[in-house]
A protein has these predicted regions:
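Peripheral, non-AAA+ core regions of ATP-driven protein-machinery
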Residues: 1-215, 219-225, 326, 462, ...
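Residues immediately C-terminal
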Residues: 112, 298-299, 305-306, 392
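The Walker A (P-loop) glycine that initiates the GxxxxGKT/S ATP-binding motif of P-loop NTPases
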Residues: 218, 280, 302
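Basic, amphipathic alpha-helical bundle interface domains used for macromolecular binding and assembly
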Residues: 35-46, 61, 68-78, 285, ...
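Walker B catalytic acidic pair
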Residues: 295, 301-302, 313
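P-loop NTPase nucleotide-binding/switch module
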Residues: 171-206, 210, 240-290
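Walker A/P-loop
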Residues: 215-258, 320
């Protein structure tokens, strides 16, 4: 048979669209033509594949070869198609049965010796292959990652000759079984390790219970970073769908091995990070920090030290839960449903309001420092809290109920109420959901309107205040939002926006 078809997968963002590798052998002078919009790395595949076939002791067809990677309008890059191209050549030249390649997808880069090297982005391809009911052939180094897609039949290989023997029936390969090495979770740091800061811990609990964004402001050394790092431990465990989304993003970003499966991510980029590092980008779009924090926590320490233009790009994903990166030929959509936790000092030196009087910043310096944060960005942060310095002990005794397990139990109860009532966390309520689930009595509504006018709160800030009040009521396991919930939620708003 002079025509063979092999199935493979490309990588576009966190998606893995299907690619059909068609190999045709014709009479004529020996040559190889590769079509289907291949990038440079794919065009180089023909040399790698030829050397791999010859060095494996197999016959490279001395005929006119045409390779088509369909669909032609899908950009293709990397060495992930090497294995599919090699199998297509061998099947078209009769060295292995072409019918054996039906319902089988192949991924892998070939070394010149015929060894099969690992690639990135295997998990999205594994999930897509599982949805199609296909078997997936991957490099042995990627097999454990592919097995995260439970129910998928995975064939793990180290060398091209193993596959030839497998398809010819001489040495069938047993489907790979996961060893479970990637299912080990690291313990979260405990909330009881944070001394004092009762108000800040309360705000952290509220943020976890409703998936609210949070901003800590205070002098250095008051525990802002310590508090933020405890938030992932308070959040409910990821379900299988969420865990696979997180793992797929890490796979695409080469964050392997996936030793954190199935934990929520905690990302802490440096304040010198560029816009592309934060939201993603590049000539070949790659996920940024906001995507790597999907279903987890994005912690921005020293918030005003970030470039203002970088911070402003957070506004859209904070509302929509995704980011779209457009290039000349590509338009890639990355998920970005993260929980923002930020920390900042009250002034450039950090000691404004300290009893010691150490602050020497002028009014102009303080105003210029705070003006780095725009009103629309601050509007999108639900909880604003000043973390004051407290007296500390060298060996503090943890308080009863002041630990991660106790707080996480309260969060789980509140989240369960929200899922039963509206199917999402309170922070993600849309306007119709807000009207339906955050209704107030006439007296409380008038009281809230007066408070919003005095504090000059925007309509968006008022809506976020209502969502926080809804979360406070859920923590108390009550259905109606009361005046006490509104009053506490109001305390978490800055005095001006």
């Amino acid at each position: 048979m002079s025509l063979a078809i092999v199935l493979s997968r490309a990588q576009v963002g966190v998606e893995a669209p299907a690619v059909t590798v068609e190999c045709h052998l014709a009479n004529g002078l020996p040559a190889l033509t590769l079509v289907g919009l291949p990038e440079g790395a794919v065009r180089e595949s023909k040399d790698r594949v030829r050397s791999a076939i010859l060095n494996s002791g197999l016959e490279y067809p001395a005929r006119r070869i045409t390779l088509n990677l369909a669909p032609a309008d899908l950009p293709k890059d990397g060495g992930r198609f090497d294995l599919a191209i090699a199998l297509g050549l061998l099947a078209a030249s009769g060295q292995l049965p072409a019918h054996a390649l039906q319902d089988v997808e192949c991924l892998g880069e070939l070394a010149l010796s015929g060894a099969i090297r690992p690639i990135q982005g295997v998990l999205p391809a594994a999930l897509a292959a599982r949805a199609e009911g296909h078997t997936l052939i991957v490099p042995a180094a990627n097999a454990e990652e592919a097995c995260l897609a439970s129910g998928l039949r995975v064939i793990a290989v180290n060398h091209l000759l193993e596959l030839v023997a497998h398809f010819n029936g001489r040495a069938p390969i047993v489907p790979y079984e996961s060893s479970g090495l990637l299912h080990l979770s690291k313990p979260y740091p405990d909330l009881s390790e944070v001394q004092g800061q009762t108000a800040a811990k309360r705000a952290l609990l509220v943020a976890a219970a409703g998936a609210h964004n949070l901003l800590f402001s205070g002098p250095p050394g008051t525990g802002k970073t310590l508090l933020a790092s405890r938030l992932p431990g308070l959040l409910p465990p990821l379900d299988e769908h969420e865990a696979l989304e997180v793992a797929a993003i890490q796979s695409v970003a080469s964050q392997s091995p996936l030793t954190s499966w199935p934990q929520r991510p905690f990302r802490q980029p440096h304040h010198s990070a560029s816009g592309a590092a934060l939201v993603g980008g590049g000539s070949r779009p790659q996920p940024g920090e906001i995507t790597l924090a999907h279903h987890g926590v994005l912690f921005l320490d020293e918030l005003p030290e970030f470039d203002r233009k970088v911070l402003e790009v957070l506004r859209e994903p904070l509302e929509s839960g995704h980011i779209v990166i457009a290039r000349a030929r590509d338009r890639v959509r990355f998920p970005a449903r993260f929980q923002l936790v930020a920390a900042m000092n009250p002034c450039p030196c950090g000691y404004l309001g300290e009893p010691s009087g150490r602050c020497r910043c002028s009014t102009e310096q303080i105003q210029r420092y705070r003006n780095k944060l725009s009103g629309p960005l601050l509007d999108r942060i639900d909880l604003h809290l000043t973390v004051a310095r407290e007296a500390t002990a060298l060996n503090p005794t943890p308080q009863t109920g002041d630990d991660t397990a106790s707080a996480a139990a309260l969060v789980a109860q509140a989240r369960e109420r929200q899922q039963r009532r509206q199917g999402c966390a309170n922070a993600f309520l849309d306007l119709p959901g807000l009207r339906k689930h955050c209704s107030l009595s006439s007296a409380d509504e008038n009281w809230l309107e007066t408070a919003c006018e005095r504090l000059t709160l925007s309509l968006r800030a008022a809506h976020r205040l209502l969502k926080v009040a809804r979360t406070l009521a859920d923590l108390e396991q009550v259905d109606a939002i009361g005046r006490s919930h509104l009053a506490e939620a109001l305390q978490y708003r800055p005095s001006s926006n």
